[in-house]
């Protein structure tokens, strides 16, 4: 706003859940809360992952924003300097988070190798950025000294490989052996393993994925 540009909020990754009304209500409530936060913070617009959510997001902004934008609004009470931007967030590493990164990365890579770029996973629309974030965290947790689970166990290559086998096996059991065998699940798991246990951080996961396309 200080430079006259519109401030656009982040994407709501939720998608409508057509076969579960309760889950759908939860998803819509999360989108509504996210968009209310954005417009009340001064954003001028936003975006969503699914066209079915456009009307909801538009209604929230129409309710709280009088004009076409809020560029005259300044957040004068907030002061951020360069040092603030360099602060590393503190948080916990959990086994559930470790498993989730593995599971989502394998699911996305299998879909991508099979020709899909945007993939619904756990009622969220995911793209390559999801896989990039997941695999980057996995690599960093293994190689960084603070890569320790909240229960005290070090995140190691051995732990990762064991959980990768478990998560891949769970996917095979979920979708069935035949669907697993004809899909891109094994190449996806192999790619995730290769890039995660590598001694150096690969700058771009999808470059390696492209090399595996037929």
Task: State where each predicted segment sits.
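Expand to "…catalyze enediolate/carbanion chemistry for C-C bond making/breaking, isomerization
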Residues: 1-214
């Amino acid at each position: 706003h200080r430079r006259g540009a519109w401030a656009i909020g982040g994407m709501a990754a939720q998608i409508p859940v057509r076969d579960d009304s309760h889950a759908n209500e939860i998803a819509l409530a999360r989108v509504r809360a996210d968009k209310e936060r954005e417009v009340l913070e001064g954003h001028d617009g936003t975006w969503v992952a699914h066209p079915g959510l456009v009307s909801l997001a538009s209604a929230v902004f129409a309710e709280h924003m009088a004009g076409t934008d809020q560029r005259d609004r300044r957040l004068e009470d907030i002061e951020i300097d360069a040092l603030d931007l360099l602060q590393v967030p503190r948080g916990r590493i959990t086994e559930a988070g470790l498993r989730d990164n593995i599971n989502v990365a394998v699911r996305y890579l299998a879909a991508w190798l099979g020709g899909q770029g945007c993939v619904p996973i756990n009622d969220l629309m995911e793209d390559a950025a999801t896989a990039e974030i997941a695999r980057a965290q996995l690599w960093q947790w293994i190689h960084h000294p603070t890569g320790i689970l909240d229960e005290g166990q070090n995140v190691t290559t051995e732990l990762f490989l064991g959980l990768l086998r478990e998560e891949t096996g769970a996917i095979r059991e979920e979708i069935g052996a035949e669907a697993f065998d004809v899909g891109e699940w094994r190449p996806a798991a192999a790619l995730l393993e290769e890039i995660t246990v590598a001694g150096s951080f690969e700058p771009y996961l999808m470059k390696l994925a492209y090399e595996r396309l037929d």
